C-alpha cells in the first residue's frame, strides 16, 4: 500500500478509538462535549473514507508481522479492495449522520458520555472488520463488535428488558462465533495461513473442504441474525433507536454479509446452496412476520432480517457483488427508516405502538417525507436505491433457481405489504392517542440526517450505482441493471410491479378503521401464527428441559469427582499420609517452609526435565 493510503487507513481506523478513550478518561460526565467530539470524529472519518473511495482503483495491501509460530505468521494488516473502500464509505457516512441524530435524540440522557463512547468504540470495531487482511484480525474485531453492541443495547441497563436483551444478543452471537473460531483453527491446521490473499492464491486442486466454509458460515449466521440464530435481533430493539439504526441496520448485521463476500472463494457449492436456501427462506418468513408487529422498531427489525436473507441468497447464488451492492443501498434506506422511527418516538413522547399513532403527516412533515421516501426505496420502486440492487438479485435468482425466485418474490410482496401498513398506521388517518395528538417535529439535529439519508441517498443512490458498484464487478452488474430499466417484461420487474400494486391495496385495507389492526381482526389465526415466537419457545423448552438436566448431571460429576476425589481425597489425603510417614504435619503456617518446598519442588522438576 502506498504510504499516503496506509496513513489514511490508520487515521480512519484509530480516530474513533482515540475518541472513545478520551471520552472514557475525561468526558464521562461532560455529555454534550462527548457528543460533539464523537460526532466530529465520525464526520472526519467519513471525509477520509470518501477520499479513499474516489482514489485510483485497484487492490492495495499493508501488513506487519506481529508473531511467528514455526512456519505460521500472525500479523496485522489491511486489504483494501473495491468492496472494502465501498464499505468504509457507507459505514462511516451513515454513522456520521446517525451520530448527529443522536445529539438531539439523547439530549436529555444523563449517560450521554457513555453512549457516545460506546458509539466510537463500535465504529473502531466495525471498521477493523472492513479492512482486516486475515481471519484472526477479523475475529478480534468481530468480538469487539459483539462487546460494543452489548454495551449499547444495554444502555438502559436499569430496565430489565434492556439488560436481558443485551445478554441474549451476546450469548446467541457467541454460539455462531464458536463455529467461526473452529473454522479459523481448521484453516490454520490445513493451510498454515489465515491471510486472505495467501488463501486466495492456494486454490487447492481437490477444492476447498466443505467443512471450512460451513464453520465460517456460522459466524455469518450469528452476526447477521440468520436462521436459527435470528432470535436476538428483535429483542435488541431495547437499545436507544440510534443504536438500532447504526448497529442493526447499517453496520453490525451487515458485517456478516461483508465477511461472506470476503471469503466467497472458500465456499463450496454445497455450502453456497445452503446459504442461498437459508437466506431466501429467511427473507420470506421475516417479511411475513413484520406484518404481525405493532411495535414500529420490531417491524423494522423483521424488515432487516428479510433484507439480510436477500443478501445471503445473493451470496449463495455466487453473486457476492450484488450482495455488497444491496448492503450499501440497504444501509441508506434502512438507517433512514430507523431514524424516522426514532423521530416519531421522540415526537410522540416515547410511544412505540403503531396502533396508538396516526395523523403524524400533518405534525411531522419532514419526518414523514423522509420516511415515505425510504419506504419506497425499501419496496424497490423503480429507479430508487433499493430497486437497483434488489431487482438484480431477483433476476439472478430467476436465472438460477425457480424455488429461490419464488421465495424472494414472496419476500418482495411481504415488503410492500408491511411497508404500506406501517406508513398508513403511523402517518395517516386520525390521531389514535393523546401522544399522537400532541406530537411535534424533531429538532434540526434529528431532521437533517433524515433529509440527507432519506430524501437524498435513499432516492438518489441508485442513480450513482455505477460509482458505488465495485470496479471489478461493474461489467457483471451495471449492464444488467441498465438493461432492466428498459425491459418491463423481465420476471423481476413483473414481480416488483405486482408487489407494489398489492402494497397500494394494503394501504387502503389498513385505513378502514382507525387504531385497529385489520389483519388481526380479519385473520386472527394467521396473525397469531406470524406473531408467535416459535424459535424463542423452542429454545426456552430446550434450555429448561434438556440443557438444565445436562448441567445438573455435570454438576453432580463435579461434586463427586473434582470436589470429592481430586480436592478432598487427594488434596487432603496426600498431605495427611506424608505427614504420617514423616511424623510431622506439612501445614505449619510458616512462610519459610512453604518457600523452601516451592524451591525444592522447582529444582526437582528442572532436574527431571533436563536429565531426560
Q: Which residues are covered by each model-predicted region?
A:
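Aromatic-capped, Gly/Pro-kinked transmembrane alpha-helices
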Residues: 470-488, 512-612
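Hard-cation-handling environments
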Residues: 439-503
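Hydrophobic alpha-helical membrane-insertion segments
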Residues: 40-54, 176-185, 374-378, 449-464, ...
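Hydrophobic transmembrane alpha-helices and their helix-loop junctions in integral membrane proteins
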Residues: 83, 94-138, 147-441, 445, ...
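N-terminal signal-anchor/start-transfer transmembrane helix
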Residues: 13-28, 96, 221, 283
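Membrane-entry segments of alpha-helical transmembrane domains in multi-pass membrane proteins
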Residues: 2-14, 30-36, 73-90, 128-141, ...
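Transmembrane helix-loop-helix hairpins at membrane boundaries of multipass inner-membrane proteins
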Residues: 1-8, 21-117, 190-204, 231, ...
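Membrane-interfacial helical/loop segments at transmembrane boundaries in membrane proteins
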Residues: 60-73, 197-201, 392-396, 467-486
Amino acid at each position: 500500500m502506498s504510504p499516503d493510503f496506509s496513513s489514511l487507513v490508520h487515521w480512519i481506523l484509530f480516530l474513533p478509538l482515540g475518541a472513545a478513550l478520551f471520552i472514557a478518561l475525561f468526558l464521562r460526565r461532560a455529555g454534550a462535549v462527548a457528543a460533539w467530539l464523537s460526532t466530529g470524529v465520525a464526520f472526519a472519518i467519513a471525509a477520509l473514507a470518501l477520499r479513499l473511495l474516489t482514489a485510483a482503483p485497484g487492490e492495495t495491501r499493508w501488513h506487519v508481522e506481529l508473531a511467528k509460530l514455526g512456519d505460521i505468521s500472525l500479523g496485522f494488516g489491511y486489504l483494501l479492495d473495491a468492496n472494502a473502500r465501498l464499505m468504509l464509505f457507507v459505514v462511516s457516512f451513515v454513522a456520521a449522520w446517525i451520530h448527529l441524530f443522536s445529539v438531539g435524540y439523547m439530549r436529555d440522557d444523563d449517560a450521554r458520555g457513555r453512549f457516545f463512547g460506546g458509539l466510537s468504540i463500535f465504529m473502531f470495531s466495525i471498521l477493523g472488520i472492513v479492512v482486516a487482511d486475515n481471519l484472526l484480525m477479523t475475529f478480534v474485531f468481530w468480538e469487539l463488535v459483539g462487546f460494543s453492541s452489548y454495551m449499547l443495547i444495554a444502555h438502559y441497563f436499569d430496565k430489565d428488558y434492556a439488560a436481558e436483551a443485551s445478554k441474549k444478543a451476546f450469548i446467541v452471537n457467541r454460539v455462531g462465533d464458536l463455529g467461526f473460531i473452529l473454522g479459523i483453527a481448521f484453516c490454520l491446521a490445513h493451510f498454515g495461513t489465515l491471510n486472505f490473499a495467501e488463501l486466495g492464491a492456494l486454490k487447492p486442486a481437490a477444492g476447498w473442504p466443505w467443512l471450512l466454509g460451513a464453520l465460517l458460515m456460522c459466524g455469518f449466521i450469528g452476526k447477521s441474525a440468520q436462521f436459527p440464530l435470528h432470535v436476538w435481533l428483535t429483542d435488541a430493539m431495547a437499545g436507544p433507536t440510534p443504536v438500532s439504526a447504526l448497529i442493526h441496520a447499517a453496520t453490525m448485521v451487515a458485517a456478516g454479509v461483508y465477511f461472506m463476500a470476503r471469503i466467497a472463494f472458500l465456499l463450496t457449492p454445497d455450502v453456497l446452496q445452503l446459504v442461498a436456501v437459508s437466506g431466501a427462506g429467511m427473507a420470506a418468513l421475516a417479511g411475513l412476520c413484520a406484518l404481525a408487529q405493532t411495535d414500529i422498531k420490531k417491524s423494522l427489525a423483521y424488515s432487516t432480517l428479510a433484507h439480510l436473507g436477500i443478501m445471503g441468497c445473493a451470496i449463495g447464488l455466487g453473486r457476492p457483488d450484488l450482495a455488497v451492492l444491496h448492503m450499501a443501498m440497504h444501509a441508506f434506506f434502512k438507517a433512514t427508516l430507523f431514524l424516522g422511527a426514532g423521530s416519531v418516538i421522540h415526537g410522540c413522547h416515547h410511544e412505540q405502538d403503531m396502533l396508538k399513532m396516526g395523523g403524524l403527516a400533518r405534525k411531522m412533515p419532514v419526518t414523514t417525507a423522509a420516511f415515505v421516501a425510504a419506504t419506497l426505496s425499501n419496496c424497490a420502486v423503480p429507479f430508487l436505491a433499493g430497486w437497483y440492487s434488489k431487482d438484480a438479485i431477483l433476476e439472478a435468482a430467476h436465472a438460477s433457481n425457480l424455488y429461490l425466485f419464488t421465495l424472494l418474490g414472496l419476500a418482495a410482496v411481504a415488503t410492500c405489504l408491511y411497508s404500506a401498513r406501517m406508513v398508513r398506521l403511523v402517518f395517516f388517518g386520525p390521531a389514535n392517542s393523546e401522544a399522537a395528538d400532541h406530537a411535534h417535529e424533531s429538532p434540526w439535529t434529528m431532521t437533517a440526517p433524515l433529509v440527507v439519508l432519506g430524501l437524498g441517498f435513499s432516492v438518489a443512490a441508485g442513480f450513482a450505482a455505477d460509482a458505488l458498484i465495485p470496479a471489478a464487478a461493474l461489467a457483471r452488474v451495471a449492464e444488467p441493471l441498465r438493461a432492466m430499466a428498459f425491459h418491463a417484461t423481465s420476471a423481476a420487474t413483473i414481480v416488483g410491479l405486482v408487489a407494489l400494486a398489492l402494497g397500494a391495496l394494503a394501504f387502503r385495507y389498513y385505513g378502514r378503521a382507525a387504531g385497529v389492526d385489520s389483519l388481526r381482526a380479519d385473520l386472527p389465526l394467521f396473525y397469531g401464527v406470524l406473531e408467535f415466537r416459535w424459535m424463542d419457545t423452542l429454545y426456552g423448552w430446550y434450555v429448561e428441559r434438556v440443557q438444565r438436566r445436562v448441567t445438573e448431571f455435570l454438576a453432580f460429576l463435579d461434586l463427586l469427582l473434582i470436589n470429592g476425589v481430586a480436592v478432598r481425597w487427594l488434596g487432603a489425603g496426600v498431605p495427611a499420609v506424608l505427614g504420617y510417614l514423616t511424623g510431622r504435619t506439612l501445614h505449619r503456617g510458616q512462610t519459610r517452609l512453604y518457600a523452601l518446598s516451592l524451591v525444592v519442588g522447582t529444582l526437582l522438576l528442572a532436574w527431571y526435565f533436563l536429565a531426560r
